[in-house]
Amino acid sequence: MKRIIAPVAALTLAACSSLAFAQGDTLSFFITSVGSGDGANLGGLEGADEHCATLAEAAGVTGKTWRAYLSTHAADGNDAVNARDRIGSGPWFNANGVQVAANVDDLHSDNNMLSKKNSVDENGDQVNGRGDDPNMHDILTGSTLQGMAMDAGASCSNWTSNGEGSAQVGHHDRQGGGANPTSWNSAHGTRGCSQENLESTGGDGLFYCFAW
């Protein structure tokens, strides 16, 4: 029996190593498995980007530039930032090797492959959607349908507030309520910016991460 177990263990280890290599080689899109824990206060774009990189590295992915899919409005002398302009040019693949979009225009069209099945976290696990307990389908974006920045009041003070305000969110499962219920990036605004507010709307402070 021992002679059989050793080769099987070796094959299992090799398979796991191959899977990790494949994921690290292709993974360039995911939903964060956890948020900041402080509502929509992500530490600004810089803090959100760092969170993306930290989760990716924990999943075994290194050597890539990660950016959170988040927009900010013009403030304090700084120009507005559009989510679509900060995520690279594509293509993007999830942790299971599925190409979700070929380029920026494809991502913001009906041709993308974003869905509850394909919009997974950095480990390849599905994120709770409508009908699950708890529902966590509200994904922070602060963006329009085309990935552009919105007016002040749609990004919780440019992702630095956990108090009053609102953040525009999308539905990763492509269903629910709001002005654009099937939109992955611009379904509706939240009731506030605190963790409790986000959870009461149907989210958990999660956001999309893209890499190149």
Regions found by a protein language model. Name each.
Residues A9-A10, A20:
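Cleavable N-terminal signal peptides
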Residues F21-W212:
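Secreted/extracellular ectodomain signature
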Residues M1-V8:
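Bacterial N-terminal signal peptides that target proteins for export
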Residues A15-S17:
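N-terminal signal peptide c-region/cleavage motif recognized by signal peptidases
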